[in-house]
């Protein structure tokens, strides 16, 4: 950790709270951050710190390390807004919202009322066979080979297959979609990020306009029937929701899968627990969501407020640092241990009114991936000679993961 120069410190921020954290360096490191950087951070930082590099582009914001403090914020949409949180539109000089993620009440309530039934548990359960088949097709391509590039051959393709199926978008453009997604979510360069946002917007708007003219039974066509404030959704709202599905569906599960399968490859004996007691898979997924959560998201202070006695000014960013809060020793007993029978909750899929819209699908994807790998393959491990690297930043993941078995 490094102390930031005084020139970057607002007047209301005490010097002793200002830090620059390696956890948000947005680069590859050789040591697993869940075993090094995060426990060190929990042991040394106060409950609230002003981190100079916490937001993409090395922009500052407040880091909360406490689970309870973060949950209190998530339950308080009056004081902590999400309006424009990701700066996606602002990055390209526009003002649309990512829907429902960047909307606030009361319109957020109306958006979720229209969307929640479409992502309800029973709706997602109806996709189970389709999701399982997607997993099996990918696994069958490498299971007899004895090794795989897990990220390239499975974790990038599997959740994207499912989102593209849902939106009825062409599977043969997956590589291009992935390139755009990485340029948006894994760069520190705002020009690169903005160029990718423009490409995604241009593509999605073309699809939306075509579906508006020639509707089918796909999800995008159905969005036009959604109502808000007594009217149908407009094209900008339909786009804002499709953009939400694009950035959410193309990355979060991919990053989680890489983190999970890296852990199981480094500690193969933990696979044996799940093979011997497959009933643990459901709770194991929840524990992985706690221990290997990838995303640091944010809220924006809507007004002057205090957290732990520290003044927060309107417009300042406050973290929802799920990788960090999952290791809060004041909330979790022995947080450094991955325990498949742990029952404690987590906030890796959000909380409050902004609980993840796709959480039931995400859980199902993770559970099925584990079930199918454990069924199809013998015990896997990190491939001989392969050195795992970990990307630290706002979406923590393993960029490559070579596994072998047999």
State where each predicted segment sits.
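Cytochrome P450
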Residues: 1-406
């Amino acid at each position: 950790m490094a102390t930031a120069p005084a020139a970057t410190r607002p007047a209301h921020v005490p010097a002793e709270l200002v830090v620059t954290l390696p956890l948000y360096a947005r680069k590859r490191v050789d040591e697993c951050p869940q075993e090094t950087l995060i426990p060190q951070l929990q042991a040394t930082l106060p409950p609230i710190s002003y981190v100079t590099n916490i937001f993409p582009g090395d922009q500052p914001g407040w880091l909360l390390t406490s689970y309870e403090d973060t949950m209190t914020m998530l339950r308080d949409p009056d004081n902590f807004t999400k309006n424009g949180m990701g700066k996606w539109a602002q990055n390209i000089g526009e003002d649309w919202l990512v829907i429902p993620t960047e909307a606030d009440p009361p319109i957020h309530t109306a958006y979720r009322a229209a969307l929640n039934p479409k992502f309800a548990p029973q709706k997602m359960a109806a996709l189970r066979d389709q999701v399982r088949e997607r997993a099996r097709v990918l696994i069958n391509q490498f299971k007899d080979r004895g090794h795989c590039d897990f990220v390239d051959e499975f974790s990038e393709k599997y959740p994207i297959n499912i989102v593209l199926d849902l939106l009825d978008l062409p599977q043969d453009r997956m590589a291009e979609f992935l390139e755009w997604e990485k340029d948006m979510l894994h760069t520190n360069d705002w020009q690169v990020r903005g160029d990718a946002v423009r490409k995604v917007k241009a593509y999605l708007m073309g699809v939306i306009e075509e579906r508006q003219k020639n509707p089918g039974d796909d999800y995008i066509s159905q969005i036009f029937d959604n109502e808000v404030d007594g009217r149908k959704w407009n094209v900008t709202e339909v786009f804002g929701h499709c953009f939400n599905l694009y950035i959410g569906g193309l990355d979060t599960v991919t990053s989680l899968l890489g983190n999970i399968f890296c852990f199981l490859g480094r500690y193969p004996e933990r696979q044996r627990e799940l093979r011997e007691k497959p009933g643990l898979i459901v709770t194991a997924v929840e524990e992985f969501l706690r221990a290997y959560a990838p995303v640091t998201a944010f809220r924006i202070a809507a007004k002057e407020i205090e957290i732990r006695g520290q003044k927060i000014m309107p417009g300042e960013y406050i973290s929802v640092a799920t990788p960090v809060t999952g290791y809060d020793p004041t909330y979790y007993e022995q947080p450094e241990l991955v325990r498949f029978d742990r029952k404690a909750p987590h906030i890796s899929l959000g909380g409050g009114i902004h609980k993840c819209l796709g959480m039931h699908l995400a859980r199902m994807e993770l559970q099925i991936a584990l079930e199918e790998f454990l069924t199809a393959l013998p015990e896997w491990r990190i491939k001989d000679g392969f050195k795992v690297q970990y990307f630290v930043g706002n979406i923590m993941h393993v960029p490559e993961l070579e596994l072998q078995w047999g």
